[in-house]
Amino acid sequence: MKFKAKSGHAATAAIVAAFALCGHAQSASDVRIGDVRVGFSLATGADTVRCSQMKSLAVTTNGNAVTATWRGHPVCGDGFTVTAKMALMPDGGFEYTSFRYEGNDAQIDVRRISFPEVTVPRTDATAIFRPNTVGEVFRPDWRKFRRGKDVSASGVNWLTFGCIAALNDGAASHFLDQRGEARLHTVALAVVQGPEPGTLVLCNRYAPPLTDALRRAGGLPYTGVYAPYTGGWYEAAKMHRSWLETTPWFKKAAARDFSKLREIAIWMWSRGGVEVSEPPVHWFMKETGLKVALDWYWWHGIPYDTSFPYFWPPRDGVDGFRAAVKRMKDRGAFVQVYTNGASWDCDDPRWEEGGMESAIMLPGGKLFAKMYNVFTRHRLARICGEAPKFQGIIRQLERNLRESGLDGVYMDQISCGAHNPCYNPRHKHAPGGDAVEKGYRAYVQSVRDDNPGFILSSEATSETYFDLFEAAILLYSSWERCGKGSLPQSEPVPAVSVVYRGAEVIFGSFATPGGAPAWDPMWGKKPDGDEVEAVVAKYPDQFAVELSRGIVWGIQPMVHNFTMKDVANPRLVKDLQFMKDSARFYFENRDFLFDGELLKPATLKCATKRVEFLSASCYKRVKDSTTYVQKALPTVFHSEWRAKDGREAAVLVNWTREEQKYELDFEGVRKSGSIPPLSWKLERRF
């Protein structure tokens, strides 16, 4: 039987039927919709309930509406029923509108709902567009993954946006997203190796709270869409954006006043007290006349990644700190400082004053804690959304900072990391998912209410929090430094600039002019035997690549650990000139790069170059750091933009120290030319 969509168009090949998984003898299984199959699984503490284990399946239809009902399970009982509802769409896809289970007689909790699980065809060349970092195209070696194993899983933390896709050249690609109020819940997206050769499974996953009521009966509290389509990562991001921008929370976020952030030409991510952090800001503004935003780390009276959340007072004293803020602002700078809104040092003596009552706990009672600082060896425990003691400390801190004259604060780890299920028995919320997101949203809103007009930012974009933060830092223009892999297997793509454009400002990179990581004097004596200058000089292209890549993506430029020592270093003369030129180019082209719309990537031909990158960090000596290699990096980066008045242009940058030629095909308009070393070019389409 063929089904008609409500519009009257035939839903492409929408033949719905029950069938058994290849190689299995189950009496019930998935639902076929066209060329894909739709099923579910429910993960419990001990095992997984799968649709293939159910005793019967009935499928009913009404116009474009499909209802699948599975009944009976060997463990959950004969009365166990799972019902899924889908609405077929003209393109051959469907909206998953409802999923519910009931009648579970077994004493097992449902810890994860996975629906829909959409089995689609693939080839060995199929790539995955996944919502990690800024967006990523991952080209797996499918031979390395066993049937039913995750090939790629995104979330619950670091879920940059709510869609995923399987990409095919010359055949249909496959898109899956989360809609409705998914952002308020503990969710993930995954791609699994398929049940038969030549298949993969797109999965939406949800971790519900664990209660007696939800053990017996529960379901998905949101909807989403599966769609076959023609195209790649850009079309997938655009599809999700087309829904997101219709939501009231997106419209409210986009209506905010971003004018103060729009005036920024470059960010400086500084680490140190007043004597380290203030002079470079004045130097750059004097040299260029451009506005600098200082993202100030290590202003606090405690060692970094240690003794959180007791940041106050500043290490230069309250008066010295406030005087420095005033001097920078009087000369036109934007100033914000680092705070951590989500972690408490569980090895600090003050942990006993409320840490356990505030913390996220994993199943079994362990803290969700990590040691970042290898010198102090203190662990930071992640904090739940139900944490009045911790939140009270942070709220007072942010008030102190606003009263110090700052433009805003950065609240680390919330947007990227406040998504975990929590099982702390001291908390009033049900164990499991959803409590952390709801608690953190209320907490961040309270900070906003306490500090009207204060600009808040956090780490990474997420649909859960983007409407509460005006800005987000993303460091993945420094892809290799962050250890994210090499082309062609792992390719960063600027999907965030498609999904969030106009509703949240994105800034950031790890581009470090001198190349050396910073050292906090409060950690103690710096380790000996690290010949930094001799090592970092071996990576001459890294700074320009990292700085320019983000600008091309529409991310506000940032330099990391830029000090007056860099100004005096003759090795860096060309890099610092490129830094000035890049900030000026970004500022002069904000009608495209800040206000405009990122278009589908054009085709550009240019030479490639082998480039080595040093993956150094504060917690690893330079000589012990890893070198990442891009064997064939394009020497000209590019992106295409449409301004609000309809003008279209390509942004081009030659990050190398040699002149580079290029050929550009911009939607049928062909351009060619050359770009001098370390320079930018705006190529108008018409």
Give the ranges of each region predicted by the language model.
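Aromatic- and glycine-enriched glycan-recognition loops and surfaces
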Residues: 262-362, 391-395, 435-445
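Carbohydrate-recognition beta-sandwich/jelly-roll modules
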Residues: 26-298, 311-314, 327, 331-335, ...
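Active-site-adjacent "subsite" loops/lids of carbohydrate-active enzymes
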Residues: 320-322, 326-327, 334-404, 478-498
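Bacterial N-terminal signal peptides that target proteins for export
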Residues: 2-13
